[in-house]
């Protein structure tokens, strides 16, 4: 088993600071966070945060041109690039998805994250599911073309919150090209199935496991006790 750190978790560190710390703690690899870098001056004034002003982020618009630089940085600290963790989903611009795959190939990285679609109460699940299948058919073709696998994450609020739902979608595709990220924290919020059973359900589609802390906490909300 190998351990990798997803850099969303260290928003206060630069790429090099994080890589150095990972080496110190004995990590095998790194999942680089890849998305748009904020340009809003107000956001840039904010303290580092997971989702907004995250210093440990690779700009998705420059990821191809910076691929060799990022690989050199990872190599410097003895880190395998385990994944490029994008926030793209299967319905988004295929060129942007392919660009990230090309960047991954240059880095010697075998996979990128491309997520499934969010559930929308204003739409029918069957319609969203069909759209996701159509989207991942295009993603699978890009994976075959580039040799880079695309994984989608089990995530609350999406149509793949549980292992069963994730397997249903993944089963339309070759596990060589489309895989699933089992997220132990996300299933606490939504989609929990007994751990061993969940892994058995995912079978050959299970590609990565995210480990993080999550729990329900009782709080008083509007004068009532609720779990949040």
Sequence positions of predicted segments:
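Active-site groove signature of glycoside hydrolases
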Residues: 104, 109-125, 146-159
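Acidic/histidine-rich catalytic cores of soluble enzymes
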Residues: 19, 138-228
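Glycine-/small-residue-rich active-site loops that bind phosphorylated ligands and cofactors
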Residues: 10-11, 89-92, 120, 157-158, ...
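Short glycine-centered, acidic/aromatic-flanked micro-motifs in structured strand/loop junctions
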Residues: 7, 86-88, 116, 152-156, ...
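N-terminal pre-domain/capping segments
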Residues: 1-114, 137, 144, 175, ...
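Short low-complexity, flexible loop/linker segments enriched in glycine and/or proline
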Residues: 44-48, 97-99, 127-130, 166-168, ...
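Active-site cleft segment of glycoside hydrolase catalytic domains centered on the general acid/base Glu
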Residues: 122-135
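A short acidic, helix-capping loop that chelates divalent metal ions and anchors anionic groups
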Residues: 38-42, 120-125, 188-190, 219
């Amino acid at each position: 088993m190998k351990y990798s750190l997803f850099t969303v978790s260290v928003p206060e560190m630069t790429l090099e600071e994080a890589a150095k710390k990972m080496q110190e703690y004995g990590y095998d690899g790194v999942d680089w966070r890849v998305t748009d870098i904020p340009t809003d001056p107000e956001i840039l004034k904010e303290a580092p945060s997971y989702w907004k002003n995250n210093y440990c982020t690779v700009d998705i618009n420059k990821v191809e041109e910076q691929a060799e630089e990022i690989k050199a940085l990872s190599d410097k600290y003895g880190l395998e690039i385990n994944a490029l963790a994008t926030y793209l989903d299967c319905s988004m611009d295929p060129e942007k998805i392919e660009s990230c795959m090309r960047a991954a190939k240059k880095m010697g990285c075998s996979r990128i994250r491309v997520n499934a679609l969010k559930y929308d109460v204003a739409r029918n699940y069957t319609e969203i599911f069909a759209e996701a299948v159509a989207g991942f058919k295009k993603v699978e073709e890009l994976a075959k073309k580039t040799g880079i696998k695309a994984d989608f994450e089990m995530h609350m609020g999406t149509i793949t919150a549980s292992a069963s739902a994730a397997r249903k979608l993944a089963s339309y595709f070759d596990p060589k090209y489309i895989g699933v990220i089992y997220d132990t924290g996300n299933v606490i919020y939504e989609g929990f199935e007994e751990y061993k059973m969940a892994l058995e359900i995912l079978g050959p589609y299970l590609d990565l496991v995210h480990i993080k802390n999550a729990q329900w906490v009782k709080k008083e909300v509007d004068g009532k006790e609720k779990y949040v």
